[in-house]
Swiss-Prot record:
Sorted UniProt keywords: Cytoplasm, Ribosome biogenesis
Principal location listed in the UniProt entry: cytoplasm
Protein name per Swiss-Prot or TrEMBL: Ribosome-binding factor A
Function: One of several proteins that assist in the late maturation steps of the functional core of the 30S ribosomal subunit. Associates with free 30S ribosomal subunits (but not with 30S subunits that are part of 70S ribosomes or polysomes). Required for efficient processing of 16S rRNA. May interact with the 5'-terminal helix region of 16S rRNA.
Molecular-function GO terms, alphabetical: ribosomal small subunit binding
Complex formation: Monomer. Binds 30S ribosomal subunits, but not 50S ribosomal subunits or 70S ribosomes.
Keyword Coiled coil: no
Length: 127
């Protein structure tokens, strides 16, 4: 990705966060965080990564609502960012947050499973 595409992506991320939180009134849209926007080098397409607070059903409903509002969102972006052509937007759920919390949970589980074994060996448990 070139420098211009990166800058446009960062600006779109800021504007999308504002549009989704303040301008969209669809009740299906839950608590959404725009985690990343990747714009192609020719500025024709933008992949928007979002994280949604809630279960799979909430994520699915939010994604459907965002897909339905895609035209409105794109026109808002076009008004806020001066580009010859506003990139086509594709929404995608960002799994990295969920993956990270799962890894953290597994580490905690392994750590708590380890502590009783150390105490049984006669070693003091310092932490």
């Amino acid at each position: 990705m070139n420098i211009r595409a990166t800058r446009v992506g960062e600006q779109m991320k800021k504007e999308l966060s504002d549009i989704i939180s303040r301008r969209l009134k669809d009740p299906r849209i839950g608590f959404v965080t725009v985690t990343d926007v990747r714009v192609t080098g020719d500025l024709q397409q933008a992949k928007v990564y979002i994280s949604v607070l809630g279960d799979d059903k909430q994520r699915e409903n939010t994604l459907k609502a965002l897909e339905k509002a895609k035209g409105f969102i794109r026109s808002e972006i076009g008004q806020r960012i001066r580009l010859r052509k506003t990139p086509e937007i594709f929404f995608e759920i960002d799994e990295t947050m969920e993956y990270g919390s799962r890894i953290e949970q597994l580490i905690r589980q392994i750590s708590s499973d380890d502590h009783p074994a150390k105490e049984a060996d006669g070693e003091p448990n310092n932490g």
